C-alpha cells in the first residue's frame, strides 16, 4: 500500500467515525468506501502477471567503451489482458544506469519488443536482467514489485594495445628440436590434445588426459612445428592495488591480452595461465576470441600462493619450453621456485603495488623482485602508474629479436 493508500485508509476511518457520531449514514458510507478502496486495489495488484521475458544482445561481445543494443521481448502467456506496467532492467554498474521501460497493455498471447542501449564502462562478463516490474492501480493506492526471471550477458573485452612484433624465436623457444616442440603439455605420448567437440571421432579420445582433467579430451591432428609461448598472469589480490582502469590489475589484464594477441598474430602456440587456475594439464588457447573471453572474465582471487604459476611454468618447460611472458606482482618466497623452473626465454612485467596505492610508501619490493628475477635468468621491468605498455614491452624485449 502506498502513502496515498494509507492516507485514504486513515481518512476513511475519520469520516466513518464522524458519520457514526453525527448519525449521518451517507457520510459513514463514504468513510467505509475510503477504507475499503485501498484494500481492494491492493488485491487487484496481487494478481499474477503471466508475462514471459526474453532478451537478446547485439553484439554479444564488445570492446571497452562500446555500445550494445538490448532487445527485450515481453509476452503475455495468459488469457487475460495485463495492465500497463513500468519496468526497470537490472544492469551491472559497469553498464551504466538502469533503463526504465513502459510495457503497454497486452492481450492474451500478445507480445511486444522494447530496445535500449548500454555502454560498456568496464571489462567483464556482465549480467543483464532480470526485469523488475512495478504493478500499480490507476489511483496510485497500492503497488507491487515483481521480478520476472531471465538473464542475458554482455562480454566486455579487455583493451588490446599494439606491441612490437616478435622475431627470431625458434620453434620450441630457440634451439629446441622440432620433435620436442611438438610434444604437448598433456603428455609426451601424444602430439596434442584438446577438449572434445560434438562430431569428433570417439576413437580419438585420449583417455589419460581425460582422466587427469575430468573432461573428455581428444587427440589433435599433428601440426607443423610452431613456436610456443606461455603467458602467466598474477591474479592474486595481494599482488595488486588500485581500482578500475587506474588499478594495477586492469593494467595487467591489458598487458596479458595485448601479448596474447601479438603472439597469436605471430603464429605462436599460446598457453595462458592465471595464478588462480588449478594446477594440472595446461590447455592451449584455441583462438584469439577464446583468449579474450577468458581474460574478460578473470578477476582478483584471495589466494596468496603462486604455486599454480610455478607448476604451469614447470610443466611448460618440461615438455619443450618456449617463450615465457609473466605479468607479476611483487614476489617473495616463490621466486626461487619460479627461477628454477624458468624457460630459457623469460620476460617479466613486475607491478609496483605500493606505487598504485594511494599514500603508499615505496619499500622497493618491485625493484627487489626485478633484481632477483634478472639474477635467475629473466628479463624484467617495473610497472608503475602511467607506464606505457608499448614502451615497456619495447624496452623489455630488446635483445630478444624484436622488430619495431
Regions found by a protein language model. Name each.
Residues 1-48:
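A eukaryote-biased signal for short, well-structured alpha-helical docking elements
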Residues 8, 149, 165-167, 198-404:
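Exposed, interaction-prone extracellular/peripheral surfaces
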Residues 26-27, 36-283, 323:
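An amphipathic, basic-hydrophobic helix/alpha-beta surface used to engage anionic
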